[in-house]
Amino acid sequence: MALLEMKHITKKFGDVTALHNISIELEAGEILSLCGENGSGKSTLMKILCGIYPCGDYSGDIYFSESELKARNIRDTEEKGISIIHQELTLVKNMSVLENIFLGNEITHKGLTADNEMYLRCKNLLQQVQLDADPNTRVGELGLGQQQLVEIAKALNKQVRLLILDEPTASLTEKETEILLNLIKDLKAHNIACIYISHKLNEVKAISDKICVIRDGEHVGTKDASTMTEDDIITMMVGREITSLYPHEPHEIKDEILRVENLSAWHPINTHIKRVDNVSFSLHEGEILGVAGLVGSGRTDMVQCLFGSYEGKFEGNIFINQKQVNIKNCAQAIEHKIVMVPEDRKKHGIVSIMGVGKNITLSSLKSYCFGKMVVNEAKEEQIIGSAIKRLKVKTFSPDLPIGRLSGGNQQKAILAKCLSLNPKILILDEPTRGIDVGAKYEIYKLINQLAQEGIAIIVISSELPEVLGISDRVLVMHQGKLKASLINTALTQEQVMETALKE
């Protein structure tokens, strides 16, 4: 019998059916990838499995290790050996690695915590997940990839038999991702099953035994991973064939709009360290300029200098339309028609408790005001409605808190906010991070449309196929230096990486 069986699961929120008659099976030591667009029902299904939505809140049956599972809460499922690691990690940053791993599961003898035993156990767990860290290290001092490994060690400490990973590599470097995927394969060898949720289809293909696709709350199908291509997965996810993930519309590249000369930036704290080292480049109207490089190459630092949001010291010459400008803060950048979609949308891009509409107009309120204080609400509503329609933001209402939207729809709303400022230069830092394939495709189409309208666009992405798929020209950076500016005529990933790494 299978380790996990979920049979005919249906979940409703009021009159809205979030899941309809979904069934999945998983064997011990098997890796099942769960794919679907944001809002398809993946998270709802996992919340049912983990006891976040308790027995009675849904219809259908769940069997785990040949016994019926009627979980009332997460504690019930953890005791059975089911653990979930969310995209937003749940570790307590101010506590040590050891304290996080044993939180709520302390080893005690006669009412006293067995500190030495926990320390040795923690060392052993960290060894299992290949994390070279002292158990007494504060979690906040670790990188995201290392914190992810602490979460897995915590699950192993609870005798996990089924590990659920939700977008585990969204914020990880390529090296950290490789370590994590190898660890999952190692867990598989020890008969631990895994449900893997990711929008990165290359990872899904590399790691999975089976791939299950959910669309609009319905089970589209589960197939052997070896029989599926990435295009097959995309077609099942979106319900239509996408002939090219990177749509390319011809657009005219016109005059130079931006020129940067000798831009340098220093670390905000360790001021002797250069994060950007004497970088010079140009950008033209209607051009899509990709910026490629490994983590730490200085890409984000460079564009933050252009937008006036860099926290440390920076210097250099910036010219817009051949005229030298002084940009020391975001307000000055916006005055010069430069806008930016930031890398961390939740931290820097949205006010999560505010409505979608208010987020869209937040940066351009001055243009909807009578005088300095009174907002022209009719004009504001018109702008909001037009922006939501143009960018296809899926929301029940403009007043819905933006934090309740999917990542893709949040990103579209941030783009709408930027476009409400009528920019001439648009900077996009990781524009599709944590976004499903359908939303990515729509954002790529929008980037092309904006280039056709003459907007100059800078795109930073950790995904090389994305940079190569949408850019007219690619800047290659490494350790703060600009290594090359390459015209994108049949550029390959290998050529870009070779350029970045060669001395």
Swiss-Prot record:
Q: What is this protein called?
A: Xylose import ATP-binding protein XylG
Q: What is its EC number?
A: 7.5.2.10
Q: Its biological function?
A: Part of the ABC transporter complex XylFGH involved in xylose import. Responsible for energy coupling to the transport system.
- What reaction is this protein's catalytic activity? D-xylose(out) + ATP + H2O = D-xylose(in) + ADP + phosphate + H(+)
Keyword terms, alphabetized: ATP-binding, Cell inner membrane, Cell membrane, Membrane, Nucleotide-binding, Repeat, Sugar transport, Translocase, Transport
Q: Where is the ABC transporter domain?
A: 4-241, 258-499
One GO molecular-function annotation for this sequence?
ABC-type D-xylose transporter activity
Cite a GO CC annotation.
plasma membrane
Tell me which species this is from: Haemophilus influenzae (strain ATCC 51907 / DSM 11121 / KW20 / Rd)
Q: Which NCBIfam families match?
A: PRK13549.1 (NF010069), xylG (TIGR02633)
Q: Which PROSITE patterns match?
A: ABC_TRANSPORTER_1, ABC_TRANSPORTER_2, XYLG
PANTHER family registered for this protein in UniProt: CARBOHYDRATE TRANSPORT ATP-BINDING PROTEIN MG119-RELATED (PTHR43790), XYLOSE IMPORT ATP-BINDING PROTEIN XYLG (PTHR43790:SF1)
The EC category is translocase
Taxonomic lineage of this organism?
Bacteria, Pseudomonadati, Pseudomonadota, Gammaproteobacteria, Pasteurellales
Protein location: Cell inner membrane
Q: Could you tell me which Pfam families the record lists for this protein?
A: ABC_tran
Q: To which protein family does this belong? A: Belongs to the ABC transporter superfamily. Xylose importer (TC 3.A.1.2.4) family.
Which SUPFAM superfamilies did the record assign?
A: P-loop containing nucleoside triphosphate hydrolases
Cited CDD domains: ABC_Carb_Monos_I, ABC_Carb_Monos_II
Oligomer status and interactors? The complex is composed of two ATP-binding proteins (XylG), two transmembrane proteins (XylH) and a solute-binding protein (XylF).
Q: How does it sit in the membrane?
A: Peripheral membrane protein
Q: Which residues bind ATP?
A: 36-43
